[in-house]
Amino acid sequence: MNIADGRQAFPAPAKLNLDLRITGRREDGYHNIESIFCLIDLQDTVYLKSRDDGKIILHNPVDGMPQEADLSYRAASLLQKYARNPAGVEIWLDKKIPTGAGLGGGSSDAATVLLVLNRWWQCGLTQRQLIDSGAALGADVPFFIFGKNAFARGIGDRLDEMDIPKQWYVIVKPPVHVSTAKIFTHEGLTRNSASSIMPTFQNLQPFRNDMQAVVFKEYPEVWKAYSELSRYGFALMTGSGACVFTACQDRNSAYNIYRQVSDLYEAYLAEGLSKHPWLSV
């Protein structure tokens, strides 16, 4: 969508980890995972405006964060070396995805910047090259570039499309920010889950999140939110938290739960997507 001042709007959807297992620690300090990634229609909007002077300007960085540290800024900077002509861009972020929530908002914004600028700047990078580049920005970025619901391996950069039944989700965000680094370095974290032999949506049930127990111990607020949501059905934490969610087969069922929990917590009602909205642009 074009805006009067020349900006164009692009979607950046959130994700849920419907299952997340840690299968080992790598020599470089990172962890190998296996996870089901599902796109949802809760999304940020990334506004971009091209410049021809080589400057990258992020107009509304997160409070207290220099623009050079923002993933969207870093994504644009990363692509500049591949641009055919001196290329710049102005970036505005309309944030609807809560931060520090395990929903991948910052990573999705960065992936959208990579996808758009790869086209605008005629960088010519393949999807695989974009995924490899995006992995340097964050573990969730490759999934958003892949653009379809997926089973992820490695550090999240080995992706296979997975068919996920259409579902609605009620997402609850407790009033706490979870430190991903703290959880991944915790001595109590499970790091030896068995790798899946035939990973399908059905075969991986019952779903789990290997980080959940540690997060509950270190952040009681997440446990409280999980306990409340569990009253209505099977609940699970996404990513390293802090959000927890439950799935429903139809919107009415999800909305009834949402009405109850939204009186107690910041809550979201979201529909599952089969592909990134960018694929329809």
Curated annotation (Swiss-Prot):
Per UniProt, the keywords (alphabetical) are: ATP-binding, Isoprene biosynthesis, Kinase, Nucleotide-binding, Transferase
Q: Which GO terms describe its biological process?
A: isopentenyl diphosphate biosynthetic process, methylerythritol 4-phosphate pathway; terpenoid biosynthetic process
Is the keyword ATP-binding assigned to this protein? yes
A molecular-function term among this protein's GO annotations: 4-(cytidine 5'-diphospho)-2-C-methyl-D-erythritol kinase activity
- Lineage top rank: taxon: Bacteria
- Pathways per UniProt: Isoprenoid biosynthesis; isopentenyl diphosphate biosynthesis via DXP pathway; isopentenyl diphosphate from 1-deoxy-D-xylulose 5-phosphate: step 3/6
| Functional description taken from the UniProt entry | Catalyzes the phosphorylation of the position 2 hydroxy group of 4-diphosphocytidyl-2C-methyl-D-erythritol.
- Family, similarity comment: Belongs to the GHMP kinase family. IspE subfamily.
Q: Which NCBIfam families match?
A: ispE
Instruction: Please report the name of this protein according to its UniProt entry.
Output: 4-diphosphocytidyl-2-C-methyl-D-erythritol kinase
Q: What is the organism field in this record?
A: Neisseria meningitidis serogroup C / serotype 2a (strain ATCC 700532 / DSM 15464 / FAM18)
Taxonomy of the source species: Bacteria, Pseudomonadati, Pseudomonadota, Betaproteobacteria, Neisseriales
